[in-house]
A protein has these predicted regions:
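Glyoxalase I/VOC metalloenzyme domain signal
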Residues: 1, 5-74, 81-165, 172-176
Length: 176
């Protein structure tokens, strides 16, 4: 087992300022395995958690809690051997999706304390190297009539601001 965990495997892909973690359960009989296998059975492969880098994890988390956010994981800090640390906390959003706040404090590592960067694949030297600065949007699927309440949740809990709105006159799919 490359990670030492018999519960899960996570591969981290990083390009520019974008980091994506691909996690799968290895043991379906653990609480992690049961939770994630149920998510996969219900949704197929997909996003379970969206993480945001924040300047002050405690403050961001406490504000969201004070506004009614449902807590999934309380504040937790992990330190590395070089004196840096990473603080995280997770809240529930819509459906089965969660949001994790991540604050890096003098942490210089590749991903999180304890993770070791693997050698780059030699194929990377043979192909064009894109560089991602950010993810400009994500899509969440909602039942008809549920999107407005989700937008309002993000505005209330996280101070998100609507900069573009769409409705059925703009989006047309066969599933409407």
């Amino acid at each position: 087992l490359e990670t030492g965990s018999r519960e899960r495997v996570t591969h981290v892909v990083k390009n520019g300022k974008v980091t994506i973690c691909l996690t799968s359960p290895l043991n379906w009989k653990t609480s992690f395995g049961e939770e994630h296998s149920a998510h996969i059975a219900k949704h197929g492969d997909g996003v379970k958690d969206v993480a945001f880098a924040v300047e002050n994890c405690k403050k961001t988390f406490e504000v969201a809690k004070s506004r009614g956010a449902e807590v999934v994981k309380e504040l937790s800090t992990v330190e590395d051997k070089d004196g840096g640390s990473v603080t995280t906390a997770t809240i529930k959003t819509y459906g089965d999706t969660t949001i994790t706040f991540i604050e890096r404090n003098n942490f210089k590592g590749f991903f999180m304390p304890g993770y070791i960067k693997k050698k780059e694949d030699p194929i990377c030297n043979l192909i064009a190297q894109p560089s991602f600065g950010f993810i400009d949007h994500i899509v969440g699927n909602h039942a008809v009539g549920d999107m407005e309440s989700t937008v309002q949740w993000f505005e209330k809990m996280l101070d998100f601001h609507r900069f573009w709105s769409i409705d059925d006159s703009i989006i047309h799919t066969e599933y409407r």
